[in-house]
């Protein structure tokens, strides 16, 4: 087994004390064990740091970084990817859930299919109260939140993803060299553009195809009250101008990038 593992699991965290231990326990219980976990704490004000430090002391596959200043979410996502030295990489949201064979199934597919740059499991949405009760918000029909993008033609791949218009595939397992090429967080770490995850996927489609594995599952937590994108942008301290013109910024970037 490679000391650094085959895949880096990047977990950017901020005030996740209620769920982070359970999330890491779920990851370390995966059927596939050849990994490194990198946790980057963006100056949490709760007990996230204390919990993560304790966990990392008990498992040498877990590397923990604490930052004395909150550098913002984009910066934190970029930080964990920048530290990756393995063949594969995946971003993890602290409150989402994988099926037990998520890593095993998706890595196996990428190992056997060189023309694919990323792979994710079929996806459903849920809401979890922190008493550990889980409520399925909506049963996901096939390819509702993620879809295979497997055309050999780059332009057709881009068009397919633009028509699909969902950002969940940002949480795919990627080939590290390809996601570092595509990483919008590195290109513009403090740029107030809401669609950074969407832009990253569009860029990586230049390099290859995206797969959806129907035998593994990615369960994405969403708010039961369905906060709007605008409210979430306000929470992240986007300015009114950035919120108003976020779509314009994306369009400008897209036409510059793809012509």
Q: Where is each model-derived feature located?
A:
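Nucleotide-sugar donor-binding/catalytic module of glycosyltransferases
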Residues: 1-233
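C-terminal, non-catalytic tails of nucleotide-sugar-dependent glycosyltransferases
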Residues: 151-152, 173, 239-259
């Amino acid at each position: 087994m490679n000391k650094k593992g085959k895949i880096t699991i990047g977990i950017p965290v901020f005030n996740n004390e209620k769920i982070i231990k359970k999330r890491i326990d779920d990851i370390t219980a995966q059927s596939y064990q050849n990994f490194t976990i990198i946790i980057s704490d963006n100056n949490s004000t709760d007990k996230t740091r204390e919990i993560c430090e304790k966990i990392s002391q008990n498992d040498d596959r877990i590397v923990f970084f604490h930052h004395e200043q909150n550098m913002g979410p984009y910066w934190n996502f970029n930080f964990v990817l920048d530290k990756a030295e393995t063949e594969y990489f995946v971003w993890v949201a602290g409150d989402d859930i994988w099926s037990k064979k998520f890593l095993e199934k998706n890595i196996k597919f990428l190992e056997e299919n060189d023309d694919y740059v990323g792979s994710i499991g079929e996806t459903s949405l849920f809401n979890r109260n922190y008493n550990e009760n889980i409520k399925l918000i909506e049963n996901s029909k096939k390819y509702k939140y993620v879809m295979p993008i497997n055309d050999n033609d780059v332009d057709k791949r881009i068009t397919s993803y633009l028509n699909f218009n969902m950002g969940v595939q940002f949480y795919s397992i990627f080939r590290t060299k390809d996601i570092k090429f595509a990483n919008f967080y590195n290109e513009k770490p403090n740029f107030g553009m809401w669609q950074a995850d969407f832009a990253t996927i569009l860029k990586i489609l230049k390099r290859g195809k995206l797969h959806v594995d129907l035998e593994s599952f990615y369960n994405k937590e969403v708010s039961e009250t369905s906060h709007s994108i605008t409210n979430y942008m306000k929470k992240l301290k986007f300015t009114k101008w950035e919120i108003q013109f976020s779509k314009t910024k994306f369009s400008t970037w897209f036409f510059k990038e793809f012509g």
